[in-house]
A protein has these predicted regions:
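Short, conserved, GDST-rich strand-edge loop motifs in beta-rich repeat architectures
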Residues: 477-487, 525-541
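Residue-level signature of beta-propeller blades and closely related beta-rich strand-turn architectures
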Residues: 68, 112, 156, 199, ...
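Conserved beta-propeller blade signature
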Residues: 61-64, 105-108, 149-152, 192-195, ...
């Protein structure tokens, strides 16, 4: 970590420490909250959408959008890896959708605002063209026709639009396949659009003039389309190449448009794009961890010797460029990987390499935060990563990793990490060298640290390890299901033996969002939500449940707040009651039988908050802008303790709360 970070944290601490006094309660001195900024512990590069096209200097550049707040449209010199241009996309957080028009104009479609942006040749700032389809918050992929009109696939209503580059007029082609909320992939060819869907794998052909939708039959061997995803799709030379998988390798099916038949299947293809057809008629793609050339005429693959390692190996852009380098004469294959690396290969010399470009690192939203004996742990959303933070100075050691859903320092000092996707559980020893072969390997021979302990997708179909708690030396994991499913799980992992007890649908059709424990009993808060926001629930309210770990049975479950969809967090208070939060309501239950003891409506929204406890009080996040303190006692009432925008609330010991707001981390000192 650069020394500048700790220096910055110290300066911020000196300038911006805020002291707040909570309202006094009768007979007590009011506790004081001192909010201390600790900086931004997580930053990295995440590239999703990209293309290879003319750059700002007229020469071929690699274009990618780096995720952040805001996201940036970047042009990279493929010969040097230098940044040629970095233009913010105001309001956009990232992009799966980047494409170039025939005249060199670059377009990008973003999430979570669903806007379309345009960068004209020679410009250094983008034009925000707005949300083409009101209510569609993701533009998942875009493509262009010969005239430069832009077509895009959207979420949450699975629509396709056309943006007329000359007039700005937008045509709404409507939902392409009923019941499919995502047009996950799209490409244009000869007056037709070819699309693929999610959560189920359907293929469609759309006539751009008439809007007529024709369904394409599934390829042989694909099986049931349910819970499969048409993750990417490219049309090259009259054939549609489409991968049915996830971010990981899967079959690439080849559909011949003229004969309307499936003509080939390429196994273990990584996506996210394949190259245009080269001068020799070949197409370059990443298959089985190697850059290979595919010959459409003979349906053969030829290796290049350029291999890839790590968990994520797909191309975030791929094309051709003249590099004018000694080992790279003529035209070379160039592209980018998800963490900002460039790969390149020269067909004449066989020379290849992978190196880090100079794309800017962006701060990462903190998704998980936990206090430890000597450190604070922060885990990142989307870009991912785990940072170990000095609680006094804010100095952070960043480690590149997966998206982190939950963190826990156990009593023996081991840090457990709940990851997305595949609801993976890892153990990390902070005293040893970090080495993740999937994301950030250490020196050769370094043992894996963190170590993967569980992957809960293959057998019980889970995707998010969202909650962690230690119970009698074991680790309880609460999860959210994968894909268009309902029904999370409670998993009890024993570090001593490596055994795991897995209880799917511990509460029927509900996901497990929060966990706490007392005396060998695990208590959980659940949500009616499933794996996708489009998954229709079967129940009307979140629950709280109790599970006896030794007896391996559920003791009770209850609905504490009728109509509240999610009980997002639970904790045991200093009064021995089981406290929880469901949207705007905080409540206390008897841990023995789940009987409601206390309830307070404090907020105005249904935003999910956290609830934590010290030996003196319970602290609860309401409306993501207020933190209330509830002292023990049947007559005590919640008092406003801190008013500050935030996203997560944690605790470290008895006198520190932890608060996050986007990428920013704060320590809240509790004193009297």
């Amino acid at each position: 970590m650069r020394p500048a970070r700790s220096l910055l944290a110290l300066i911020l601490t000196a300038l911006f420490v805020t002291t707040l006094a909570a309202p006094a309660q009768a007979g007590h001195n009011p506790p004081t909250a001192t909010v201390v900024p600790l900086g931004r512990p997580l930053s990295d590069v995440l590239l999703i959408g990209g293309t290879v096209a003319p750059g700002p200097n007229g020469k071929t550049a690699i274009w990618n959008v780096s995720s952040g707040t805001p996201a940036y449209l970047n042009a990279i010199d493929p010969a040097t890896g230098d940044s040629l241009l970095s233009a913010p996309l105001p309001g956009g957080d990232g992009s799966y959708a980047v494409a170039a028009a025939p005249d060199g104009t670059i377009y990008a479609g973003t999430y979570y605002n669903g806007h379309l942006y345009r960068l004209r040749p020679g410009a250094t700032t983008v034009d925000d063209l707005g949300q083409p389809l009101p209510g569609e918050t993701f533009i998942l992929r875009i493509t262009l026709d010969e005239q430069g009109n832009v077509y895009g696939g959207t979420y949450p209503h699975g629509k396709v639009f056309r943006y007329d580059h000359a007039t700005g007029a937008v045509r709404d082609y409507g939902t392409i396949k009923a019941g499919q909320g995502y047009v996950k992939s799209i490409d244009y060819w000869n007056g037709k659009l070819y699309t693929g869907s999610e959560p189920d794998a359907y293929f469609s052909e759309v006539d751009v003039d008439t809007g007529t939708v024709t369904e394409i039959p599934p390829p042989p061997g694909m099986g049931d389309p349910k819970d499969q995803v048409v993750y990417d799709l490219n049309v090259r030379g009259g054939r549609m190449y489409t991968r049915v998988s996830t971010a990981f390798p899967g079959p690439l099916y080849v559909w011949d448009i003229a004969s309307r038949t499936w003509v080939d299947t390429i196994p273990n293809e990584h996506g996210l794009d394949i190259s245009p057809i080269g001068a020799d008629g070949g197409i370059y793609l990443i298959q089985a961890s190697e850059l290979k050339k595919y010959d459409p005429a003979t349906k053969t693959l030829t290796g290049t010797g350029l291999t890839f390692t790590g968990r994520i190996q797909n191309a975030r852009s791929i094309g051709y460029a003249d590099l004018n380098l000694p080992d790279y004469p003529g035209t070379s294959v160039v592209g980018t990987l998800w963490r900002g690396e460039e790969f390149r290969y020269n067909p004449q010399t066989g020379k290849s390499e992978i190196f880090q470009t100079k794309v800017r690192r962006e701060p990462i939203q903190i998704l998980a935060v936990a206090g430890g004996k000597n450190s604070i742990y922060a885990g990142g959303f989307l870009n991912g990563g785990v940072s170990v933070v000095n609680p006094d100075t804010g100095e952070a050691k960043f480690n590149r990793f997966s998206q982190v859903e939950a963190l826990l320092e156990a009593s023996d000092g081991t840090v457990y990490v709940g990851a997305y996707p595949e609801a993976r559980l890892y153990s990390y020893d902070p005293a040893k060298t970090w080495s993740s072969p999937e994301y950030s390997p250490g020196p050769p021979g370094t043992p894996d640290n963190p170590k993967q302990l569980l992957n809960l997708k293959p057998d019980i179909f889970q995707t998010r390890a969202r909650a962690l708690v230690e119970v009698d030396g074991k680790i309880a994991v609460g999860t959210v299901p994968d894909g268009d499913r309902l029904g999370g799980a409670l998993v009890i992992y024993d570090p001593a033996t490596g055994a795991a007890e897995k209880y799917r649908n511990v509460v029927q059709d509900e996901s497990v969002y929060g966990l706490t424990t007392r005396c060998g009993i695990v208590f959980g808060g659940t949500s009616i939500a499933g794996g996708l926001v489009t998954t229709p629930p079967t129940r009307s309210a979140g629950t709280v449940f109790a599970w006896n770990v030794a007896a391996k049975q559920k003791l009770w479950e209850t609905v504490p707040v009728p109509g509240a969809a999610t009980v997002s967090s639970v904790t045991i208070g200093p009064d021995g009651l089981l406290w929880g939060v469901a949207g705007k309501t905080v409540f206390a239950l008897s841990p023995d039988n789940g009987k409601l003891k206390r309830s307070f409506t404090l907020g105005t929204t249904t935003s999910s908050g956290d609830i934590v406890a010290t030996s003196e009080a319970v602290y609860v996040s309401i409306d993501l802008k207020k933190i209330y303190r509830i002292a023990p006692g049947s007559k005590s009432v919640p008092t406003l303790f801190v008013e500050h925008a935030h996203s997560r609330l944690g605790v470290r010991g008895d006198h520190e709360l932890l608060m996050t707001n986007g990428p920013d981390l704060f320590r809240i000192d509790i004193s009297r």
